[in-house]
UniProtKB/Swiss-Prot annotation:
Gene3D superfamilies from the UniProt entry: Tetratricopeptide repeat domain
Assembly with partners or alone: Part of BBSome complex, that contains BBS1, BBS2, BBS4, BBS5, BBS7, BBS8, BBS9 and BBIP10. Interacts with PCM1 and DCTN1. Interacts with CCDC28B. Interacts with ALDOB and C2CD3. Interacts with PKD1. Interacts with CEP290. Interacts with DLEC1.
Family of this protein: Belongs to the BBS4 family.
UniProtKB keywords: Cell membrane, Cell projection, Cilium, Cilium biogenesis/degradation, Cytoplasm, Cytoskeleton, Flagellum, Membrane, Protein transport, Repeat, TPR repeat, Transport
Gene encoding the protein: BBS4
GO-annotated biological processes: centrosome cycle; cilium assembly; protein localization to cilium; protein transport
Main location (coarse class): cytoplasm
Localization annotation: Cytoplasm, Cytoskeleton, Microtubule organizing center, Centrosome; Cell projection, Cilium membrane; Cytoplasm; Cytoplasm, Cytoskeleton, Microtubule organizing center, Centrosome, Centriolar satellite
Chain positions covered by the region annotation Interaction with PCM1: 101-337
Protein name: BBSome complex member BBS4
Polar residues: bias regions: 461-476, 510-519
């Protein structure tokens, strides 16, 4: 009993620390987004090989469930031109996160780049349900509708985009719609609003200047092109347009000086060499003109205006077989232009192929309802063939067109045209019915065709991209990463960028002044 009491007294108290259970180390679960910061860093540094290596490692660790890694890999595939593979990866992202509008926007963009515009519109509409206030979705829908030629729907979507957020690119695309419709006044109105919103945008200023130039409003054209050169003295489009205006007014030396500046920036520009060639043509340096036009034709073999000018220069040099070659090629690309058939008929007449010349004149008369040169040249051919009755009919038709032009405009007719018309009228014995009664100096005994110069009044301007950018490209304006959204490790994805047009007008038309004679 005494021993039990002794042992009870000698017992030590148990430590509180020893009573605590031993803590086990927590298991390490794989974090899907732990390498996102590194992927983001390599991507914005454009170190795509290192970026792809990290993405591969990340996808192996996460068994292909890291959405951001898949997203960036899809962006890299798109940059490398592998659009189909990028579409597949973006569709995976949309499957992993179906409520994310950015994923759907990128799927739609890939479909757009593949030319599947209807499918892209469907996906953009799905994205719009998730985010109704995204200007980019409305903008890209408008661009898709433009490619489908549904201009009214495109116009509505672009107006919605401007209502949500005003952007230069949306104004440009809206202006393109009116240009494609042929409504220059509406296009100018849109571009004026765009310039008010962004007065230092040289692309907008240049396009607006070219539109005024196309309408013959030279003062405003000079003003806007001058503003372009104020902000960007090396803007080759504005310099080329300014040189074209000087060339149109016959100041060939100053125009060539301007073109020399442009040549330093864009040496392989078809409109540049076309305009230089026509400057030499205006200076009557025909060999140099042909050399420059041949270079333009090499750079743009499908441009009918360059072929037209080559045919015109060869006609002037009396190289009728070469003229026939280039004019025939131009007709293949522009079969609805009556003046091309008229020049082809002049070449055929000088090649002594009267039957085909008549056919060409008949086609020219059918297509061109307002150019009196066509009827006058046809009348000369018929008179020389002894068909005076038909020649008289063409001469009278020419008189009707001349009278109509006199009343509707203050156009000055080419002196050679007046001379030939007077001689032919006298030969046909129309007498008092002559349109022109002005006496002619130094009459010649042989009937000649009228000039195709200054008619110019009737000629279409001959430049190389007159229709101010009719095609839109799918390239993006910039490649930015937007600021981070919620979450600590998940980075915000690079946005699906708005679709933009190709660079607009390269050059404004040049004049083509030549004197072609039918012998």
């Amino acid at each position: 009993m005494a021993e039990e009491k002794l042992s009870a007294r000698t017992q030590l108290p148990v430590s509180a620390e020893s009573q605590k259970p031993v803590l086990k180390k927590a298991p390490e679960f794989p974090i899907l987004e732990k390498q996102n910061w590194l992927i983001h860093l390599y991507y914005i540094q454009k170190d795509y090989e290192a970026c792809k290596a990290v993405i591969k490692e990340q996808l192996q660790e996460t068994h292909g469930l890291c959405e951001y890694a898949i997203y960036v890999q899809a962006l890299i595939f798109r940059l490398e031109g592998n659009i189909q593979e990028s579409l597949r990866l973006f569709q995976m992202c949309a499957f992993l996160s179906p409520q994310c509008a950015d994923n759907l926007k990128q799927v739609a963009r890939s479909l757009f780049l593949l030319g599947k515009h209807k499918a892209a519109i469907e996906v953009y509409n799905e994205a719009a349900k998730l985010n109704q206030k995204d200007w980019e979705i409305c903008h890209n829908l408008g661009v898709c509708y433009i490619y489908l030629k549904q201009f009214d729907k495109a116009q509505d979507q672009l107006h919605n985009a401007l209502h949500l957020n005003r952007h230069d690119l949306t104004y440009i695309m809206l202006g393109k719609i009116f240009l494609l419709k042929g409504d220059l006044d509406k296009a100018i109105e849109i571009y004026k609003k765009a310039v008010e919103f962004s007065p230092e945008n040289t692309e907008l200023l240049t396009t607006l200047g070219l539109l005024y130039l196309q309408l013959g409003i030279y003062q405003k054209a000079f003003e806007h092109l001058g503003n372009t050169l104020t902000y960007d003295p090396t803007n080759y489009k504005a310099i080329l347009a300014a040189g074209s205006m000087m060339q149109t007014h016959g100041d060939f030396d100053v125009a060539l000086t301007k073109y020399k500046v442009v040549a330093c920036a864009v040496i392989e520009s078809p409109p540049l060499w076309n305009n230089i060639g026509m400057c030499f043509f205006g200076k009557k340096k025909y060999v140099a003109a042909i050399s420059c036009l041949k270079r333009a034709n090499y750079l743009a073999p499908l441009d009918w205006k360059i072929l037209y000018n080559l045919g015109l220069v060869h006609l002037t040099m009396q190289q009728y077989a070469s003229a026939f070659h280039f004019l025939s090629a131009a007709i293949n690309f522009q079969p609805k232009m009556g003046e091309l058939y008229m020049l082809l008929a002049v070449a055929l007449t000088n090649l002594e192929d009267s039957e085909n010349a008549k056919r060409a004149y008949e086609e020219a008369v059918r297509l061109d309802k307002c150019n009196p040169l066509v009827n006058l040249n046809y009348a000369v051919l018929l008179y020389n063939q002894g068909e005076k009755r038909d020649a008289l009919a063409q001469y009278q038709e020419m008189e009707k067109k001349v009278n109509l032009l006199k009343y509707s405009s203050s156009l000055e007719f080419d002196p050679e045209m007046v001379e030939v018309a007077q001689k032919l009228g006298a030969a046909l014995q129309v007498g008092e019915a002559l349109v022109w009664t002005k006496p002619v100096k130094d009459p010649k005994s042989k009937h000649q065709t009228a000039s195709t110069s200054k008619a110019a009044g009737f000629q279409q301007p001959l430049g190389s991209n007159q229709a101010l950018g009719q095609a839109m490209s799918s390239a993006a304006t910039c490649r930015k990463l937007s600021s981070g959204a919620g979450g600590t490790s998940q980075l915000t994805k690079p946005p699906s960028l708005p679709l933009e047009p190709e660079p607009t007008v390269e050059a404004q038309p040049t004049e083509a002044s030549a004197q072609t004679r039918e012998k």
